[in-house]
Amino acid sequence: MRQEAYFCTVKELDELGKNNIPRQLISHTHLIYSSPATLAFNSPGAEGFGVKRAGLAVPDSVMLIVSPGCCGRNTSVLSSMRAYQDRFYYLLMDETDIVTGRHLKKIPKAVAEICEGLKKKPSVVMICITCVDALLGTDMERVCHKAEEYAGVPVRPCYMYALTREGRKPPMVHVRQSVYSLLEPKKKKGNVVNLLGYFSPLTDDCELYDLLHGAGVKTIHEISRCKDYAQYQTMSEANFNLVLHPEARFAAEDFHDRLKIPYIELRRLYQIDKIASQYRALAAALGVEFEDEIPRKAAEEAVEKFREIHPDAVFAVGEWMNGDPFELALALVHYGFRVSEIYGTLSGENFVYVKQLAKISPDTKVFSNLEPTMLYYDKSQSGVNMTIGKDAGYYHKECSNVLWLSLIHISEPTRHLRIS
């Protein structure tokens, strides 16, 4: 085995092209190294919004986890949080269940038993299943339909399939579709908009709220701000949806097909000029003009202040944070900083940033967190003195680290840089 961590420079990747990304940087082509840097990534119930926590985004919902005992153990971390007490239930599978699939017949009864034991009838029961049922080929839609008929409550599937992580519809894409599937058609209101993509709200002082209000929008819905199921249902009244995360596209398409609500996508960007261009495009689509000079100036001043304090900053940018590591690295280079290393998952979608980086920072190295040779990662020649992302912080423990992982999402791109 190679005794050093595999990497490519962005210049080398650009020369290879997006259709020839080295197999070492594509995780489904090799053995997976469960690096300590990505433990939270590999254990979605342990931190942030993994499949299980996201599945409970619908107010008054509960979840039945159908799995072998080893798959559900990390849920105990979530169960200890006040907001999730008495919302997780388990149907454990034994070896016979795995061989015969008999556990599927138990699910409707388990759902009914959960509902009967609760003081308040749940709005929906989410059935969370694991890779075991993926390998068995379980038709979970059919199972949920039977459970719904048996228990008399809505039942929806929630797939915790690590096997489909890099497929057409990964678990976090599917769960977003599931949590909005309960919405029923309502009369549309021209001054209502939904924000789709996150399971926690934007910061209260996010400029997006002011821009939308200035455009005549009176009500902005986010699933995380819905206090009860009735308020959740008012999301069907929206005139249009704003998609803030690409994993919400399927959900937005479902909105369009079922509820006739169109959508506009806004990407999470950290290049101030690109953010301004995106806002201009949104304003043009809505037939209005946005006044974004104040937040833009604040962002530019934050960058300048940070550059004055840390003129010699050399960054390592990880993927375990709120953003695309390649786009963020490109933004940092544009702001005058050096980016020595990126730890990320390359795709055709973010390869455009690699091409741009190759022109202005050709020696930036790209590593894959899940590549086995990361066992031999050596930081000694990197020159890094600042890191962004939990994974980057793991590789450079002695450096200043910004987790950039707040559950309350910050839209203004450089507010994270306001550190001394």
Residues covered by each model-derived region:
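Short helix-loop-beta junction
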Residues: 83-86, 208-220, 330-339
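Metallocofactor- and cofactor-centric catalytic cores in central/energy metabolism, strongly enriched
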Residues: 2-16, 22-150, 157-176, 222-223, ...
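Redox- and metal-dependent alpha/beta enzyme cores, enriched for Fe-S-associated oxidoreductases
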Residues: 204-208, 274-367
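Glycine-rich, anion-gripping cofactor-binding loops and their flanking helix/strand elements
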Residues: 211, 224-238, 331, 340-394, ...
